Every structure is written in C-alpha cells, then in structure tokens.
Amino acid sequence: MDSTALKILQDKCICYICSDFMEDPVTSRCGHNFCFACLRLLWDDLQGNIFCPVCQTPFPPKSFSRNYQFRNMTETIRLLQKRQSKRKRQEEHTVCPKHDQPLVLFCVRDRDVLCTQCSLSVEHQGHYTCPIKKASSYHRKVLESAIATLKFGVKQVEEKLAVQHRRVLGLREEAQYQKIEIRYEIGQIKLFLQSEYEAHLNESHMEELRSFSELNGYLETLLDHVSTAKDLLKEVEAIHERSDVTLLRAYHKLQNLKSPKPWLFRTKQYGLSLPAQYSGLSRIIKQFQADVTFDRDTAHPQLVISEDRKSVFYKEAWPCVCASPQKFHLWPALLGCKGFDSGRQYWEVKVGDKPRWTLGVCQAHFSGDWSNQSSGFWAIGRYAENSYVTYGPLRTEFLPVVRPSKVGIFLDYELGELSFYNMNDRSLLYTFRNSFTSTLWPYFYIGTDSESLEILTHPTPDTGSY
C-alpha cells in the first residue's frame, strides 16, 4: 500500500481525546469515534450530559455503541504499519556494507548476495554469479514448490485427522448402541427368569397338590384296611373260642384279606435351561466353527456334490458307478470328510424347506441299519410336515415352536454332549448326553426331493480377540 494512503488511514484511526490509535473504539450519537476508556473518563468527571470533544453535541452517558468494524480496521492498519516498517528496514540492507554499492548479484556457490566489486574479489573469483532478480525468481519457484508440497502434506494430515475424528464418533455411537443392547438383553433375561420362576413355582405347587391328593387317597385306603382287619380280628377271636367247624369256616376270610401296596412318593425334578441366545451360542459359533465338507467316498450314488463339497442334492437318474462298501446304498445319505475324537466343534446346515432330512453324528462302524439306531448314532430329523424325531438311545418325537430352516450342531466330545439348535430363533432343539469313546463323523440324510442341503460357512473370527 502507498505510504500516503496508509498515513491517511492512520489519521482516521486516531482518538480525538488521547491522540493515539483507538483502543476498543466506540461511536457516539453524533457519529464520532473515541477510545472507550477515554470516553469513560469524561462521564466519570462530569455529571449530566457529555459534550462531544469534536462537535460539542450533547449526549447522555453510556449512550454509545461499540464499533467492531472500526476496531478491526484499526488492527489491520497497525499490522500494515509494522509490515511497512519491516520493509523499510530490509531496504536499508540492500547496499553492500563493504563497498557501499547496490547488491545486484548472487553467488551460487556461497549462496550470498554481492555487489559488482565483491564479485571481482579474490574471495569470489571463479564463482558463478547471476542477477539477484533471476536468482530470486528461481528460488521463489523452489519455495513455491516446497509450499505446495507442504500444503499437500498438511491437507493429507487434516484429512486423516477428519477420518480419525469420524472413527472416534463412530466408536462412541457403537459403544452407546452396545450399552443400549446390553440393557435390553439384561432386561430380556430378567423377564425370562421371572417367567421361569413363576412357571416353576406354579408347576411345583400343582405337583404338591397332586402328591397330597394321592397321599390322602392312600391313607384312606390304609384306614379302611385297618378297620376291616380289626373287625375281622374281633370276629376271629370270638370264633376262636367256638367249635372246630366254625373256626375252619371263618379261616378263609383271613386268607382273602390283602394289604394295600406301598405308595411310592416321587418328587419331580426341575431344571432351568437358558435360551441359546443367552448361553453363549454366538461365541460357540465364532470360536468352535469346524470346516465340515461332504465326503464323496461315502455318498449315495444318486447324490450330486458341489465342487467345494458344501452343497448336495438328490438326482433321480441312477449314474453308473463302481460299488464301494463305504457308500450308502439303501437311502440317500453321506458322511463328512473329517471325524472328531476330541475338542469342541460347531457346524451349521441349511435344510431349507426339505420335507425329509436327518442330521447328526455316527461312529465309523455305524452300519446304517435303521433297526439298530441305539448304537453309535445320534441325530435328529424331519420325516413329515410337523413331525420331528430324535434318533439314538431313545427315539423321541418333538415339535419346534419355529420350523427350522437352518440347524446348528455343537459337539463337546470330552463333556459327552451333542446339541442341536434352531438357528431361526436360536433355540435349543435337543441335547444328547453320552460318553463318546471313538471317532464321530458328521452324518447327513438328504431325502429324495430335489432341493439341496448346504453346509454354511461363517466368517473366520479374529482369534486375537479371545
């Protein structure tokens, strides 16, 4: 900015009272500007109206407004004044201190500004020099490139900061959501436990009433028996004193008197089983997931297995294959490729709308003879619209609340438990308890419909989180 114009602006920013740059400028009703502190001194010393120091217009104390725009302009002019002073100081150093000549050259080797006489001296003899304007233009471009690089780096850092900030917000939202979800789950567990508590109390009360009713009936029977026996005893004692013939005629009544059978009192056993969604089923799925695939060597000839050995379906056409003792021939079934003889394993099977299916495990010597399912075979299956059955030591029919289209199977070999879960509502379907002593192989009965049966694969968990 031109120095004359700057001087005019500086004069505009001078306070009429203190003759210095205005501090915290305020504007009176007459339109003149003053320092707030200066104007306050006036109304502290005077009573009544204040007269403007410039135009002598009267106005009451505190009847002014702060001029923020004028304050910003004053600060800007101060900054320009400082810059102008700095530029003047720099211009004062453009003359060579040795020879009092203008500095017009730049020594590339020594990176120093020189006058003409300095460039001819022995100190800079043979050095490449160029005009200051040319050197400054080149170095300005270098600096501009460096500035652009720095700006780009700053922009990248700012973008990363923004991303991290969004992640922090996301983590906070996720943590808040998890808190809400935990509160909801705890509330559901409390409701479930309260419902189970009331149901078990009611069932126990009904069992108590039933037992007391049976016991009272038994006591009445005993009392009747005792009364009859006492009456007969009196009669026999009376006959005992009579003749032999009379005694013998009454004897058969004693033989016909039978004591009632003892009444066995048994209380019902109660147990509480938490639903799968509250008993760590999600952790079981993540931590103990087994890579189960179908074994082609054991598959029935009419079963078609996918390339990844995760899907299988029944085909009507009978293919020409070589007979194998390992294959199932009587019905469309097959085993898994890998057997289990230790540890805990989980796999999940999609049965969809198949009308018939059976899932479970069997021992290697399992012959597939349906008449001998109590040995080496533990499974559940569907054989009709609403008919489900367990195969094993005990054949039991059951009816799920929700029809399962996906079944989760969890084997705890050491504990001797094989559990089946309905993954549609995450409820427990059935649990076998046994002492396993040999290798167990996943078993699959497909049925004769065309719909496929599929082994599902869940994403592999991050083991570092456990």
UniProtKB/Swiss-Prot annotation:
PROSITE patterns: B302_SPRY, ZF_BBOX, ZF_RING_1, ZF_RING_2
Classification via Pfam families: PRY, SPRY, zf-B_box, zf-C3HC4_4
Coiled coil (residue ranges): 171-223
Secretion signal, residue range per the UniProt entry: none
Zinc finger (RING-type) residue numbers: 15-56
Gene knockout outcome: TRIM60-deficient mice show an elevated immune response to LPS-induced septic shock and L.monocytogenes infection.
Superkingdom field: Eukaryota
GO molecular function (one): SUMO-ubiquitin ligase activity
Keyword Acetylation tagged: no
Chain residues that bind Zn(2+): C96, H99, C118, H124
GO BP: negative regulation of non-canonical NF-kappaB signal transduction
UniProt keyword terms in alphabetical order: Coiled coil, Metal-binding, Zinc, Zinc-finger
Protein's job: E3 SUMO-protein ligase that mediates SUMOylation of TAB2 leading to inhibition of NF-kappa-B and MAPK pathways by suppressing the TRAF6/TAB2/TAK1 complex.
Name the record gives this protein: E3 SUMO-protein ligase TRIM60
Phylogenetic classification of the source organism: Eukaryota, Metazoa, Chordata, Craniata, Vertebrata
Gene that encodes the chain: Trim60
